[in-house]
């Protein structure tokens, strides 16, 4: 609210407000984890608003039909591991062996330090997290697709069409997985189109602005160029 009312910045937010209040759209709806409703502020992390507000406003202004945003986002999840899609398979066996060894060493060290007897991780434990966020995301998408009329009564009876997919993740892939990012992204796009039965589904890959006006370099540059 401070930026929206401050003289030096309020013009940036003027199109999102009316009568000194945040606009609540009646033509754009959003589902974000446990929250759902007409698009307005508050659909980011607790007490915050994310890119969905501006994006949804642009989409709502462009389309005559109502718009639903299905936001499935979990911070700190990489495409290499948690968002890894089925056709990408698992990393090379040597990488999994290395991960298993490190996990077992951590548990053994913690057991010794705290006089505990926790079981050492198995290869099954190591493999289980791979693709978990992809599976959760697809379950979230399909739940909204199947139950949009119940979640948003104003849209009851209307046929829902999946019109596009926006990817705004990848920060964590710069920490050792940048060279696999391009391959994993190709698998990701292919699998989503297959799972949603939408072979020509448009994809938009957004770039984050943490570096401000400074160009990306190193691992992040590799990811952006993928």
For each of these PLM feature ranges, what is it?
Residues 1-226:
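Cell-envelope and extracellular/periplasmic
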């Amino acid at each position: 609210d401070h930026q929206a009312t401050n003289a030096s910045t309020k013009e940036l937010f003027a199109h999102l407000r009316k009568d000194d209040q945040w606009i609540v759209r009646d033509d754009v709806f959003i589902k974000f984890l446990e929250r759902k409703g007409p698009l307005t502020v508050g659909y980011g992390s607790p007490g915050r608003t994310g890119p969905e507000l501006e994006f949804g406003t642009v989409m709502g202004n462009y389309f005559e039909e109502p718009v639903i945003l299905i936001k499935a986002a979990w911070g700190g999840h990489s495409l290499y591991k948690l968002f890894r899609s089925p056709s990408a398979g698992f990393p090379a066996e040597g990488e999994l062996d290395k991960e298993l060894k490190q996990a077992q060493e951590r548990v053994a060290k913690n057991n010794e330090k705290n006089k505990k007897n926790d079981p050492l991780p198995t290869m099954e434990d190591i493999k289980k997290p791979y693709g978990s966020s992809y599976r959760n995301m697809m379950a979230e998408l399909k739940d909204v697709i199947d139950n949009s009329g119940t979640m948003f009564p104003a849209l009851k009876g209307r046929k829902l069409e999946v019109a596009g997919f926006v990817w705004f993740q990848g920060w964590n892939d710069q920490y050792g997985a940048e060279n696999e990012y391009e391959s994993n992204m190709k698998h990701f796009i292919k699998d989503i189109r297959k799972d949603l039965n939408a072979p020509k589904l448009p994809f938009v890959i957004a770039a984050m602005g943490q570096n401000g006006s400074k160009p990306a370099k190193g691992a992040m540059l590799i990811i952006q160029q993928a």
